[in-house]
Amino acid sequence: MLHFLVAVILLQIDSSRCGLPFYNGFYYDHDKGNGNGEIHFNGIRLVVETPGDPVFTYRGANVTLSCHYHYDPQLDVPRRTRIKWSKLREDSTSDQEVLVAAGLKHRSFGDFRGRTHLQQDSPGEVSLVIRDLRLHDHGKYRCEVIDGLEDESGIVDLELQGVVFPYQPLHGRYMLNFHEAEKTCREQDAVIASFEQLFKSWEEGLDWCNAGWLADGTVQYPITQPRKACGGPALSAGIRSYGERHKNLHRFDVFCFSSSLKGNVYYLAHPQKFTLEDAKQACQDDKAEIAKVGQLYSAWQFLKLDRCDAGWLADGSVRYPIVSPRAKCGPPEPGVRSFGFPKHGKYGVYCYKMN
């Protein structure tokens, strides 16, 4: 104990000679603490810089989310920092960890394992590289730089180019709670859409009068042509909102989001029509699989698939995609037409084959 007191006295005397607190790589100003034991940098600021505009890309692509940091004023001696990348959740719950790094060591988490690494091509660069982007990778990412007690961060918005489509399952309208809605979208090669994705689709002309779940737990629907059955003609066009709903108790439809494909959707030409089971087998015989709803929408959006032939899809629905509206092919607007879920009858089939 005596040795410890002597050491403290010597440190205090030594620091008083130079007029500054004890130096350990930074000058700390103990007088500017907030009373909670925190210590702030004195005259040195940690700055983290990320792009202000969203980064747009596609499913399956590789992307770099830019992040740089520096000190103001610049330091002569490099500091050891810890880097943390995380993904903000749509419903504002705790962030999802993506990657942490300290020095040359780094660790990725969950579904990001094996697909992420830090790009450090220049001083202060700690950009995140994500390979083989997946549908659920879209969203906001936080780049956090930690130096002792100092912690600064920036946000990067990653957006996938894609298509939003309303979905109502076989058993009818307003039958899905939130968790069932998420599962339903996944089964159709899609994810539950975000509000931003729905808003963008509304700007592009999506008009749908049935309310559906979104990723943040709210229930909303887009109207471009106000009318009596959809909030009334007196309301202006826009996104109608039911607000946040109970994820287990309340039931609605869902808005799903899908992006570009790694394969091709095609109509299987055949002189005879199929039952649903025959349609599935026909695709398998052609070394493919029956297409999912999200895949048909993606082919319509990205591959400009235009076919006036109704065909089975994997969920038991019958649909067809129209890029150039024409007589006897439905309404005068482009879109994916639906025959619902026929219990009887024979139709063609849309197949999906990987590249």
Model region roles, listed by residue range:
Residues 27, 32-35, 73-81, 144-162, ...:
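Extracellular/luminal immunoglobulin-like beta-sandwich modules
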Residues 178-205, 267-271, 276-307:
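Conserved hydrophobic ligand-interaction patch in extracellular adhesion modules
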Residues 113-156:
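Ligand-binding face of N-terminal immunoglobulin V-set domains in extracellular IgSF glycoproteins
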Residues 67, 85, 141-143, 185, ...:
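Core motif of extracellular immunoglobulin-like domains
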Residues 2-48, 163-165:
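N-terminal signal peptide
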Residues 63, 137-144, 252-253, 347:
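Conserved Ig-like domain signature around the intradomain disulfide
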Residues 161-179, 209-212, 227-274, 309, ...:
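Extracellular disulfide-stabilized recognition modules
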Residues 72-112, 196-198, 294:
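N-terminal V-set
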